[in-house]
Each structure stands twice: as C-alpha cells, then as structure tokens.
Amino acid sequence: MSFTNTPERYGVISAAFHWLSAIIVYGMFALGLWMVTLSYYDGWYHKAPELHKSIGILLMMGLVIRVLWRVISPPPGPLPSYSPMTRLAARAGHLALYLLLFAIGISGYLISTADGKPISVFGWFDVPATLADAGAQADFAGALHFWLAWSVVVLSVMHGFMALKHHFIDKDDTLKRMLGKSSSDYGV
C-alpha cells in the first residue's frame, strides 16, 4: 500500500485520516451526549468539556491538514461503473461531510470562547478568543453545534451504508479502495 493515493486506491495517509477521523468524530459525539447529562457536582462536569474542546481543536487542525492532503494527493476518481447520479451523490456527500465538520468546529469554538477566554488544548497551547461577552453567541452556537453534530453522524452512517451497499450489492471495489486494495474495475 502506497503512502500517497493512486488512481486505483487510497494511500496509507488518506486511509489513516479517514478511519481516525471517523473514530474521533463518533467518540466526540458520544462524549458530547454524555457530558450534557452530568450534574454540577459530578467529577467530570468540568473535565469532560475541557477534553471535548481540546480534542475538537486537534480534530479541526487535522481536518485542515486532511483537506491540504487531498490537494497534494488527490483521491482516486470514481469507478467506471458509477452512474452519473452515483458520482454526483458521492461528491455531494463528501463535500457535505467536510462542510459539516468545519461548521461543527467553528460552532464549538464560538461556544467555548463566548466568555472571552481562550481554549487551552491539553495545556500545550491556547487558542485565543476572538469575541468577548457574547452570551447570545453561545446559545445560538450551542443549538447549531447540537444539530450539526447529529447531521454529521446521520450523514456518516449513510456514507458507511453506501460503502457496504457498493461492496455487498453492487460488488464493486469502493470499500476495498479505502482499505488499500486494488480495484479490479481498473484491471489491476
């Protein structure tokens, strides 16, 4: 398996970004759902949001690097067996996932910095606040963050089901390419 993408398959770096992002996004979603259930006296009441913020900032940084990687090492093109509608749906779905992830990160940043304080990322560095005393900002961003998170989870589940559909029903190599396998549709 190559480090970079080829016309036939995704490389190690793209596959690692893909699967690591999925694990982190689902973990962050679970953490977010759990932390809103905590009472003020729970030991994790302050720790969980700090963890969520730190991982969220690192995820955003990783997302920027991932987008740059797509420019440096473009993903394989669509399989020849894809219909025009499948090609359009795949492009729209991938674009929507990226836009949702960026919007979740931005809304999380707005929630976290509404009090004018920077976000400490595991004590390694701080991300400065750009706006101060924006209580309404936090409320709006919080509602947006919630619905965007649910949207990315629903869309990513659909993304996974489509990969399984391609693998088990269409019997093409869509899923195999993300796992670093050769695509028989390309005669490899």
From Swiss-Prot:
Broad class of where this protein is predominantly found: membrane
Cytoplasmic side: 1-15, 76-91, 165-188
Keywords: Cell inner membrane, Cell membrane, Electron transport, Heme, Iron, Membrane, Metal-binding, Transmembrane, Transmembrane helix, Transport
Protein residues bound to heme b 2: 52, 145
Domain of life of the native organism: Bacteria
Membrane-topology annotation of the record: Multi-pass membrane protein
Protein's recorded name: Cytochrome b561 homolog 2
Organism the protein comes from: Escherichia coli (strain K12)
